[in-house]
Design a protein with these regions (language model features):
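Alpha-helix-loop-beta-strand connector modules within alpha/beta enzyme cores
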Residues: 204-221
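Active-site core of PLP-dependent enzymes with the aminotransferase class I/II
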Residues: 201
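Proteins enriched for Cys/Gly/acidic motifs involved in redox and nucleic-acid/cofactor modification
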Residues: 1-198, 213
């Protein structure tokens, strides 16, 4: 079966889309830019414009293949799940649980029922491990190191869309950097929702500079 991805928003979203592509390809699916059987819309809600564009991408997918399955993930579905449900999509998933996206799509294809699994992030403290070994159509690799934000700036919805800060395990980041280097990527872009907060939620004593030095020490980078 063919899967088509549409991604709005930041580099973290781009990384997470690449990770979901890998999950589908590992299960034998083909990623396409044409008409597909499954559509994954990775949404953004940082502005009203991005939310509107997210709705437009959903509508476009539904029109492109009325019989296709449409799964909506990301920040917009995390903050406005009821709105997404009313759009008649098949799967609503927020900014957690993406590792199960293939299983959820297969479940929805079989049951034909709408699946909505958006959960509150207030007490979320664990980093969801999503990894890539390749970057689709890119010459440099993005590497997600951190999730969430604790700042709660008056104008910003991101803490509500992404939850509190969660740092990725140091060794996990280094291992992924090594895999990307083996694939020929010489430049790695460390990305996160509030990347400078890396390590503040852990007791390892390791911070962003330690991680930069660790990645810079990977052979080939």
């Amino acid at each position: 079966m063919k899967v088509k991805f549409e991604t709005l928003g930041c580099k973290v979203n781009s990384y997470e889309t690449d990770a979901m592509k890998k999950l589908f390809e590992d299960r034998g699916y083909s990623v396409t830019e044409d008409v597909a059987d499954i559509y994954i819309i990775n949404t953004c809600t940082v502005t009203n414009l991005s939310a509107r564009k997210s709705r437009q991408f959903i509508s476009r997918a539904q029109k492109e293949n009325p019989d296709g399955l449409v799964a909506v993930v990301g920040c917009y579905s995390q903050t406005e799940p009821e709105v997404i449900e009313d759009l008649g999509v098949d799967i609503i998933l927020g900014t957690q649980g993406r590792r199960s996206i293939v299983d959820l799509c297969e479940e929805a294809l079989e049951s034909k029922d709408q699946i909505s699994l958006v959960k509150g992030l207030e007490k979320s403290r664990s980093f969801e491990e999503l990894s890539i070994e390749d970057n689709f159509e890119k010459t440099r690799a993005y590497l997600k190191i951190q999730e969430g934000c604790n700042q709660f700036c008056t104008y910003c919805i991101i803490p509500y869309a992404r939850g509190p800060i969660k740092s990725r395990d140091f060794d996990s980041v280094i291992k992924e950097a090594e895999k990307l280097a083996e694939r020929g990527f010489k430049e790695l872009v460390l990305t996160g929702i509030h990347a400078s907060s890396y390590g503040r939620d852990t007791k390892t004593g390791l911070g962003l500079m330690d991680l930069i030095e660790g990645d810079a020490g990977v052979e080939g980078v």
